[in-house]
UniProtKB/Swiss-Prot annotation:
Keyword Metal-binding in record: no
E.C. designation(s): 1.1.1.58
Pathway: Carbohydrate metabolism; pentose and glucuronate interconversion
GO molecular function, one term: tagaturonate reductase activity
Pfam family, one: Mannitol_dh
Protein name according to UniProt: Altronate oxidoreductase
The keyword Oxidoreductase belongs to this UniProt entry's keyword annotation: yes
A GO cellular component annotation in the UniProt record: cytosol
Family: Belongs to the mannitol dehydrogenase family. UxaB subfamily.
Gene designation per UniProt: uxaB
HAMAP family in UniProt: Altron_oxidoreduct
Amino acid sequence: MQTLNRRDFPGRSHPDKIIQFGEGNFLRAFVDWQIDLLNEHTDLNAGIVVIRPIDTDFPPSLSTQDGLYTAVIRGLNEQGEAVRESRLIRSVNREINIYRQFDDYLALARDANIRFMFSNTTEAGIAWNEADQFSDAPPSSFPAKLTRLLFERFEHFDGAADKGWVLLPCELIDYNGEALRELVLRYASHWQLPAAFTHWLTENNTFCSTLVDRIVTGYPRDEVAALQTELGYQDSFLDTAEYFYLFVIQGPQGLAQELRLDQLDLNVRIVDDIKPYKERKVAILNGAHTALVPVAYLSGLDTVGQTMDDAQISRFVEKTITEEIVPVLDLPEDELLSFSQAVLSRFRNPFIQHQLLSIALNGMTKFRTRILPQLLTYQQQKGQLPPRLTFALAALIAFYRGEREGQTYPLQDDAHWLERYSTLWNGVKHGDIALAELVNRVLSDANHWGQDLTAVPQLANQVTEQLQTILSRGMRAAVAAYS
C-alpha cells in the first residue's frame, strides 16, 4: 500500500501564505481543514508552512508525506443523520523544525506573500521567559520566536506598512490575541529593539483574539487498518474530528474578504468582541456537561452518549439548557437556541465515547465557572432559583460521596475538596452532622465560590431538600420532577 506523497497523489498546490505554529491534531482538523475548503471553493490559494515549536523529532515531520494527510470528519449533521466525510488535506506545504532549520524559519519573514499566522502551542505556550535572548537560535518561548520572526520581516521590508501580518492564535486562553500582542511588545522592549519596530507592530499588524470549538479525536489508533484499507493508502497523520466546528475571530470585518469567507459559507464569525461567544460556549456546552455528569452517573449511566439515549436524563439536559441557561445569556435567542441544538447533537455523536468520570475531573471548580454564574443571574432576574441548576448542585454534592449502587468510584478533584467531602459524608453517615449542615459547609466556602452562597435566599434550603430526595429515593426518582 502506497504512502501519501504529492508525486503519487497529485493535485492542488498553493503558494506559501500562512505560517502555523503547531503541528498537532487540533489545528490540522480545524484551521488546515478550513483553509483546504477555502482553497478548493474560492480563490484564496493559500499554502501553509507548519512550524514545530518545540525541540522534538516525535511525531515524524509532516514533510515525510509532503504535507498531505487525511481528515475524517464524523458525527451528526443538521438533520440528525450520522455522517462521515474523509478529505485529503492539501493546504499544508511542508513542516519546518525551527531547532534544525532556523535559517529556513527566518526566510519565511522575507517572503512577501506571507500574510497570516495561526498558532496552537497549548495554554502554556503564550508565556514569558525572561531568559530568552534575541541572539538565541531560536529563543525558547513561542512569543519570543514570533518576535524574532516579525523583526526579521520589519528589517527586510524596511518597515513597510503593507507587510504586516494578521495573527490568529488559537490557544485556549481568554483574549489570546491581546495576550500574545502584549508579550511580543514586551520582548521588543526587553531586547531593546528600535521604537520604529514597536510602532510597526502596533500599527501594521493585527492581533486577533479567537474562540475555537471542535472536538478533535486525533489519530484513530483502533481503526487505522480499516480506514487505510478503505482509503487505499497509508497515512501516518490520519486525523479525526467531530462534524461540528465554530471559529469566532475578534477582528476587522475586512478579514472576511481577505480569507474569502464571503465566497464560502463556513461556520466562522468575525465579531467585535468574542466575550459573548465564550460565555455561550462555557454556559451551554461546558455547563450542560457539568450539570449532566453527576445526574447521569448516579442514574447508572457511564457515557455522554448513553445519557442522550436515555429519555429521562436527556429531557433533564435539554430543559436545563433551554429553560434555565439560555434565558440569562446575552446573545440573540435564535442564535442561542441554534447553538443549543448543535450542542445536543454533539452530545449524541455516536463516534465519540465521552466517559462521564473523565468529565467529572475538578467538578467543583467547573460548577463554579460554568454553572454558578447562570444560577445567580437567573435568581437575580427572576426572583427565584432555577430548579434544575440547583438540582445539579445537589447531585454534585451527592456525587462526592463516591458511591453508586453500593460500589465506590474514583473522585478526581483538589485535595482540599476530597478531604472535606470525605469528612462531611462520614459525619452524616455516623450521625455526627445533619445533611443541612453538610450543605451549609459546602456552600459557605467563600474562598472557593467567590462569595458565601448560604447568603443567596433559599439556596441552601432548596439544595438540602433536593439532596435529601436523591439520597432517600435514588437519583432516578429524584430527577423525574425535573425531566
